[in-house]
Design a protein with these regions (language model features):
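Acidic/histidine-enriched alpha-helical segments
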Residues: 2-29, 34-40, 80-92, 211-216
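M16/insulysin-pitrilysin zinc metalloprotease superfamily fold
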Residues: 1-29, 187, 200-206, 234-253
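His/Glu-rich zincin catalytic helix
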Residues: 84-213, 217-220, 225, 231-236, ...
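Extended non-catalytic domains of envelope/secretory-pathway proteins
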Residues: 1-4, 36-37, 49-51, 63-66, ...
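Generic recognition of flexible, low-complexity loop/linker segments
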Residues: 55-58, 69-74, 145-147, 157-159
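Scaffold signal of the M16-like zinc-metallopeptidase fold and its non-catalytic homologs
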Residues: 27-60, 92, 244
Length: 253
């Protein structure tokens, strides 16, 4: 694998796909509460700056082919490696490489974590655990504001806005799906097959080319079938919306 990498080198397309993917990955990771908390906590813990993501993305976005080759030649080429083989019981002959390294533990001294100084403090309850808690008030769910619109071609649209992260999610549903073929035995599986085919080649792109174009901008366009519809799903960064919609049009039409 490393020999083929050296022979092939790093292409502009490789760099474009990496940049698009890594930026999308970090930004999309901030959409959920868990994603925000985990990233803020990790950066605060290891760098002292909870907003380290800004600097991190800046470093990734400016990476070059020369940077990749420099790191490869400095840290990987000709360096020691570790092989880990997970084998079925009784088939040890499948091991990737012989076990030729032994850890020298003669000079090892276990660190003192201070466990022997800890004292167990038993929790004290302020309620009776033998009694089932009573019902509290029903929670009030605050539904985000949304809007509806009917386009000139009678297509109905529903949307909502959120300014937390610069992303756009689009779902286009066409009536159909498994329910419409339920009473037509000669068409069973047609909805699923149609959705699978729509994820393959288009008029101007092979499936591989379409995937590569989406990776360059960190977007996704997929087609799936459900009980009552065929659904086109789009996920993209706001700045790449126009390019992504062009690829959606290519896939749909």
């Amino acid at each position: 694998a490393l020999d083929s990498f050296e022979a092939r080198g790093v292409t502009d397309e490789d760099i474009a796909k990496f940049k698009g993917g890594i930026e999308s990955q970090y930004i999309n990771g901030l959409q959920s509460v868990q994603g925000k908390v985990s990233q803020l906590a990790a950066f605060q813990t290891f760098t002292g700056n909870p907003n380290q993501i800004e600097k991190l993305l800046a470093n990734y976005i400016t990476i070059t082919k020369a940077d990749v080759l420099r790191v490869y030649n400095t840290y990987i080429k000709g360096k020691h490696s570790v092989f880990v083989s997970v084998l079925p019981k009784g088939q040890e002959k499948l091991v990737a490489a012989a076990d030729n390294y032994n850890i020298d533990s003669t000079q090892y001294k276990a660190p003192d974590y201070g466990y022997n100084k800890l004292k167990y403090v038993k929790a004290k309850d302020n309620f009776d655990r033998s009694k089932i808690p009573g019902n509290g008030p029903n929670p009030v769910v605050k539904v985000p504001a949304y809007w509806r619109k009917t386009l000139a071609n009678k297509v109905q649209v529903i949307g909502a806005a959120s300014n937390e992260v610069p992303t756009v999610t689009i779902t286009v549903t066409i009536p159909g799906g498994h329910r419409m073929q339920a009473n037509q035995k000669d068409k069973l599986g047609l909805a699923g097959m149609f959705a699978d085919m729509m994820n393959e080649d288009t008029k101007n792109y092979t499936a591989e080319q379409m995937t590569a174009e989406l990776q360059k901008i960190g977007s996704s366009v997929s087609v799936g079938s459900s009980l009552d519809g065929i659904t086109f799903r789009v996920q993209t960064l706001k700045k790449n919306l126009d390019k992504t919609l062009a690829l959606l049009e290519e896939r749909m039409l």
